Amino acid sequence: MRRRLRAVVRLLRAVGHGLHGMAIVLLAFPRLDAAARQERIRWWSIKMLRVLGIALASEGAAASGPCLLAVNHVSWLDIMAVHGVVPEARFVSKADVKRWPLVSRLVDSAGTLYLERERKRDALRVVHVVAAALRAGQVVAVFPEGTTSTGHGLLPFHANLLQAAIATATPVQPIALRFSDTAHAVSEAVEFVGATSLLRSLWTSACGDGVSVRLVFLPPRATAGADRRELAGALRCDIAAALGIDVA
């Protein structure tokens, strides 16, 4: 009973913080410069994790200048974890997110790029959009697995979006992400796989005990002249090694 009550309190606070974020987006963002917006994004992301009982830690440093970040994907919380450290990152996300209440407006404000996965040719469009962002000196983040996993392993990495980095000779920095809690080295509380709904995942996340998320920023890989499939395999091996996962 006590655990459920704590989860309810966390969820109520999360809703309040989400509404606060919406107010910032609607009222403050129009008059803030890019740096000030990024600081708001960092603050909001860290606090939302904290409200849900999740501690954020990072190791290593994000590369300076334009970069494509390649992150393993576990939960809808991954974006907040990365934004807590790299608030300037623009994520490539599935278009389904635009249908999520409240969340859609918030991720829009962070410059999210949307991919219609059902349309085969949309990937090519997004590659061009990402390449343009990288040429403009921006930081873009992608989930090469294309969907979430349980965190116990890594799914195959898709190479399509890496072409944007190769075409612009922009480095790709792998980031190893892991959620853990007091009972598990790989937390089950934040799982968002299969038929799990966003509401169900939100509830189990709020019920978690001592959940933390750790990001390990690994050395960037050069892309000039690279083969995108070989690059995808190398990035997967980098992240697997950092997480202690065997992908042989």
Predicted region positions:
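Residue-level preference for the first positions of well-ordered beta-strands
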Residues: P66-L68, V139-F143, P171, R214
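A cross-family acyltransferase "interaction/gating" segment
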Residues: L102-R105, H152-A226, A234
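A transmembrane-helix-recognition feature enriched in membrane-embedded lipid enzymes
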Residues: M1-A57, R105-A110, G208
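Soluble, non-transmembrane catalytic domains of enzymes that act on hydrophobic metabolites at membranes
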Residues: V51-A61, L77, T112, P156-A167, ...
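Catalytic core of membrane glycerolipid acyltransferases/transacylases, capturing the structured
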Residues: H20-R31, R50-V51, S64-K120
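Soluble extracytoplasmic domains of inner/organellar membrane proteins
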Residues: A123, V130-L162, I166
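A membrane-cytosol interface segment of integral membrane proteins
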Residues: L113-L134, C237
